[in-house]
Amino acid sequence: MSEPKRVDMDEVETREWLESLEAVIEREGPERAQFILETLIDKTRRTGGFIPFSGNTAYVNTIPTALEEHCPGNQEYEERLRSWMRWNAMATVVRTNRGEGDLGGHIASFQSLANMLGIGFNHFWKGPEHPRGADLLFIQGHASPGIYARAFLEGRITEEHLVNFRREVDGKGLSSYPHPKLMPDFWQFPTVSMGLGPLMAIYQARFLKYLQARDIADTEERKVWAFCGDGEMDEPESMGAIGMAAREKLDNLVFVVNCNLQRLDGPVRGNGKIIQELESDFRGAGWNVIKVIWGSYWDPLLAKDKDGILQQVMMDTVDGEYQNYKANDGAYVRQHFFGKHPKLLEMVSRMTDDDIWRLNRGGHDPNKIYAAFSAAVRHKGQPTVILVKTIKGYGMGKVAEGRNTAHQTKKLDDMTVHEFRDRFGIPIPDDKLHDIPFYKPADDTPEMKYLHERRQALGGYLPARREKADEVLQVPKLDVFAPVLEPTAEGREISTTQAYVRCLTQLLRDKSLGPRIVPILVDEARTFGMEGLFRQIGIYSVEPQKYEPVDRDQVMYYREDVKGQILQEGINEAGGMSSWIAAATSYSTNNRIMIPFYIYYSMFGLQRVGDLAWAAGDMRARGFLLGGTAGRTTLNGEGLQHED
């Protein structure tokens, strides 16, 4: 997605405008400058000028170098800890697949994510003992070996667990991906199949807002972080609810998209630019977008780029080329990237090929990542997406780094293991390398003390899952349903849907249980005779009702309220199911027992969300799902899909 080149017909006039703009920024700030620019654009359009909308910015970092917040941690310790985790994650997968073993696993994904996860764990993500509540992490499923590698250093899992990665029969192994059912005190959220994590994260973030608005739990300072792959964003579920997240003003939600430019078979957008594409998609939907493309070694070159040639070449170069650069060497980059313009060759003429090779991507620069994460957690009024450019298989050498085969690489020969050891400075002697031993220093080393200190300062270790809520709800006696049951005992017929609505109404009236019930609708309340609840308990809304409903003069008018109890998802079965999951797992994620009731139209409502239903089981969800009507008895005439 390359921006069209524009020709400047009057450079002097352009310079005058730019100088004026710089003066406004200096004297009155960027907000005033933005207002003036938007006013000028609006005036141009109103006078008939055509100014097409563009959701894209230049192919550089969103946060200028001068405005970056510097990472406060001990970077030497953090780099060594990351290196040990990289080694142990690699060793976990390679040892699992040694000899005739072919149990699978993935090395390359975590290698591209390691810096981001390290910064998050060391500086941002609040644990279960934090006074302001724990953050919720949706970890990219294929990066699970790296999370296990961290937990191993923390002492939360043993070497025996690592050896038994994907060997769980005897209860001493580790699950392939995040599975709460298999590791009930560790993983919180299953993020495979791909696409489920981003979708569920959005509705978890909205449910935190819902709990806060209804005074059930203090979730004001909690964040939901979702790590996704750039290839994963092609899943309809990944992007399908981003408009809702902006509409609901979910500033407690952060997406981090790991843009390593590759999926299993090859490039994500070989002929385009996935970061630019996602930027326009998210910005158009109303998100705050932060791009982390270039590392600090690029800063001096970008500072010299007064005529914008470097930035233009960065924009014109497609992702397939960027992948190729990191699959080769510095000489190749000099020829094929900087060689695109004579001024760029001159710019790097005093740099060696090794210097050029060290020009890093933003996702492998802790300071760039920290600045982006810090900006994201401080942003108000919008969800944030951080688009981070990385290298798939970072550190894996010629067998996988930037290669199309990176995702499938599970076995490494001795030479590659030797190179990996040297690259990350792992203190394992040559005569031990063939066995690929796990590395864990003594607990009293400065790095290990630092590892524990950082998590203790943030409220404990993550990921961690609560298996049982501290509270107990008082269940009403069966005679609460007497108004529903007694007429039927006398022989009066009643539909199952009507019985459900009456039972639900009785439960909502219970002073103890009623406030914890979460009725979830997907635009079918009138079908099921539930519209009476609109006025009774209200429909949750992020802001007060700004209009007078057309049926305001009726008893069952459409009432939206910031403290409303109903979650109305519209024509959106996946959204309804994701809200149900958020409520049904609240006993674990929020230490608050909630009881969701999701009734959907016919059984095909479940068929639309089968994978989410599987995820709900994995998460040990507790609630009620109801297929609202039976096709063979009440939907004749609706057609084959409804009747089956």
Where on the chain are the PLM-derived regions?
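A glycine-rich helix N-cap at a beta->alpha junction
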Residues: 156-168, 247-258, 280-287, 614-632
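Non-catalytic terminal/interface segments that mediate subunit docking, oligomerization
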Residues: 68-89, 110, 125-128, 136, ...
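Cofactor-binding active-site loop characterized by glycine-rich and histidine/acidic residues
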Residues: 70-101, 106-248, 271-272, 530-533, ...
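N-terminal amphipathic, basic-rich helices that act as targeting or association modules
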Residues: 2-154, 420, 494-510, 521
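Long, well-ordered, tryptophan-enriched scaffold segments
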Residues: 259-487
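Glycine- and acidic
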Residues: 3, 20-23, 70-78, 96-105, ...
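Acidic, glycine-rich active-site loops and adjacent beta-strand->loop/helix elements
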Residues: 141-145, 168-169, 225-235, 258-263, ...
